[in-house]
């Protein structure tokens, strides 16, 4: 058993010498040749880095005649480092003075008008003057303005009590227009009123469209104008089923060519024939005061419903029409 293991032992000795020589050749440099560590390196992991010296606030560097609109160009929350005023706010504790402006959250909650100084407003007006024109001399009354500009747009900007100057309600756009200012016939007007529902006020003849679906005010304005355009064009369309509408399907009672008009004309012609007076035509009978009163009472009774006033008007008009008074 000893003879076969001798070659293997010799081979291991040769490999050991080789590894020893390789390790000697690549041995690390001595301590004198090592690079010295940087002087700023911490000597201990528990030692803190030195604090950087805080800079003085901006208010101490401001000059008296500086350009204030460049400090507060737009609406922004209160910044104590940029306002050179000894502002204090808060509940005084133990009869002391309110808290100073540094780190005061109460000053962040309320809105400020530091961007709307008289100098800033004057600069804005001077910059916008080149883009403005004089008010037209012909538009000297509200009636003329409504005639030439019938569409009224209402928007609102809000001042919030908080660090943010944005308010989600500012995107809401309200459009108002009178239907009398639109080019609509009787069919188109009734159909448009049916389409808009309770957005139309009959007493003022005003259509109100309120949009708040889009995130931006401009988008809601475009959407409101789009809705008005679609409603206008849809109201002028006449569908096939609309041609088959009867008197009972109408939105409001119409006297012209109605059964009531035909019946009253037939009755009046019979009365005139009995009196041997056939000279009056249909148009002349309809233009008499008695027939006009009867027509108005019937229309009121049909559209407003049965009440004491409409029934009384109808009774009196029938008496005058048949000469029973």
Curated annotation (Swiss-Prot):
GO molecular function, one term: structural constituent of ribosome
GO CC list: cytosol; mitochondrial inner membrane; mitochondrial small ribosomal subunit
Main location: mitochondrion
Subcellular location: Mitochondrion
Region described as Disordered: spans on this chain: 27-62
Keywords: Mitochondrion, Ribonucleoprotein, Ribosomal protein, Transit peptide
One Pfam family this sequence matches: MRP-S28
InterPro entries for this protein: Ribosomal_mS35_mit, Ribosomal_mS35_mt
One BP annotation, GO: mitochondrial translation
Subunit structure: Component of the mitochondrial ribosome small subunit (28S) which comprises a 12S rRNA and about 30 distinct proteins.
Family to which this protein belongs: Belongs to the mitochondrion-specific ribosomal protein mS35 family.
Protein name (record): Small ribosomal subunit protein mS35
Primary gene name: MRPS35
